[in-house]
UniProtKB/Swiss-Prot annotation:
The gene is rtcA. Belongs to the RNA 3'-terminal cyclase family. Type 1 subfamily. Pfam families: RTC, RTC_insert. Catalyzes the conversion of 3'-phosphate to a 2',3'-cyclic phosphodiester at the end of RNA. The mechanism of action of the enzyme occurs in 3 steps: (A) adenylation of the enzyme by ATP; (B) transfer of adenylate to an RNA-N3'P to produce RNA-N3'PP5'A; (C) and attack of the adjacent 2'-hydroxyl on the 3'-phosphorus in the diester linkage to produce the cyclic end product. The biological role of this enzyme is unknown but it is likely to function in some aspects of cellular RNA processing. GO terms for biological process: RNA processing. PANTHER family: RNA 3' TERMINAL PHOSPHATE CYCLASE (PTHR11096), RNA 3'-TERMINAL PHOSPHATE CYCLASE (PTHR11096:SF0). This is RNA 3'-terminal phosphate cyclase. Keywords: ATP-binding, Cytoplasm, Ligase, Nucleotide-binding. Disulfide bonds: none annotated. It is found in: Cytoplasm.
Length: 357
């Protein structure tokens, strides 16, 4: 099989290209050479968390790999099979568990059987969706396509110390994924706020939550459900310190849109809650079915689905357009239409390939 050449500097030119390329290579068993890896970043080349994704997928697929080292600008990845089973994955310090999961999930869905993985690393870290978003928003939305996966957060890990622990269960998909046809959201059913802090006074999580609630309740009349997660000092198993908030809205016809914000040193807890609430309001004002982060995460699955998917996203991002470009490289037969401008709401139509191993 000829090697698929992928320029890692296309689109947003970051780690996302590598993650999606690895995921689709492992899934289709098409060998790839990715060059110019993270060429547009200040510290180009493979970083430790990208290396973990490579190592994990090497293990799952029995791949032959060349140049897999920190700082490498080019990598060769030749997968041979898709295994399932139990895995232990240590990403190291606060490397993002969510981003490694992004690379793993498509492969595990089409593996030989069901899979279980135990991942150590960062659950709530900068420049990455929090594990709460993956659990409550992403997995919920793609369940409409036939994906069955579950996440258990055993322990949180924040930057820079990490130490998070997450258990993941993935059910094998027996048939091709179903297409997704949801352009606009319907009536709002309610809001849910998840606010947490570790190795910090409990009032931090409470203040984050109250700030978000105050803003949302001033605009919306729908029910707001709160979940505040704190730990007494003598029973806090985390390395910490850290805090964060996820807010998501349940809307018809059975979708979720989310937003989040991370605490950091010197940032008032009230601002953490306020940031997440204001972002979610922006998402909802567009009337589209999916938030800006969900948009690019959905793209690989829309390429795999059997039939035509049509989704509305609150913002067409460079990440979304990059995900489409990577998808086209693996599935040139798929038809794609983007209706909208960069930075604006838009509609994505993809005629999927009905992928089955």
């Amino acid at each position: 099989m000829s090697i698929l050449e992928i320029d890692g500097s296309i689109g947003e030119g970051g780690g996302q290209i590598l993650r999606y390329a690895l995921a689709l290579s492992a899934l289709t068993l098409k060998p790839i050479r990715v060059y110019n890896i993270r060429a547009k970043r200040d510290n180009p080349g493979l970083r430790p968390q990208h290396l973990t994704a490579v190592e994990v997928l090497k293990e799952v697929t029995g791949a032959e790999v060349e140049n897999a080292k920190v700082g490498s600008m080019e990598i060769l990845f030749k997968p041979t099979s898709r295994r399932s089973g139990e895995m232990e994955i240590d990403i190291g310090t606060a490397g993002s568990i969510s981003l490694v999961l992004q690379a793993m999930l498509p492969v595990l869905l089409f593996a030989e059987g069901d899979s279980r993985a135990r991942l150590k690393g960062g659950t709530n870290v900068p420049w990455s969706p929090p594990i709460d978003y993956i659990k409550h928003v992403f997995l919920y939305n793609i369940s409409h396509m036939g994906v069955r996966a579950n996440i258990e957060v055993v322990r949180r890990g924040h930057y820079p110390r990490g130490g998070g622990l997450v258990n993941v269960e993935v059910k094998r998909v027996e048939e091709a994924l179903k297409p997704l046809m949801i352009v606009r959201r319907g009536r709002i059913r309610g809001f849910r706020i998840h606010s947490h802090c570790v190795k910090l006074p409990a009032h931090v999580a409470v203040r984050q939550c109250e700030s978000a609630r105050r803003i949302l309740s001033g605009i919306f009349k729908e029910k707001i459900t709160e979940e505040i997660e704190t730990y007494p000092p003598d029973k806090d198993p985390h390395l910490g310190p850290g805090s964060g908030i996820l807010i998501y809205v349940e809307a018809e016809p059975g979708i979720r849109l989310g937003s989040d914000s991370l605490g950091e040193k010197g940032k008032p807890a009230e601002r953490v809650g306020e940031e997440a609430a204001l972002i979610l309001i922006e998402e909802l004002e567009t009337g589209m079915a999916f938030d800006r982060h969900m948009g690019d995460m959905l793209i690989p699955y829309l390429f795999l689905a059997k039939g035509t998917s049509r989704i509305g996203v609150s913002m067409i991002t460079l990440h979304l357009l990059t995900a489409i470009e990577v998808g086209k490289l693996f599935f040139p037969e798929a038809k794609v239409e983007v209706d909208g401008e960069l930075g604006k709401p838009g509609i994505i139509t993809i005629q999927g390939v009905g992928y089955k191993p």
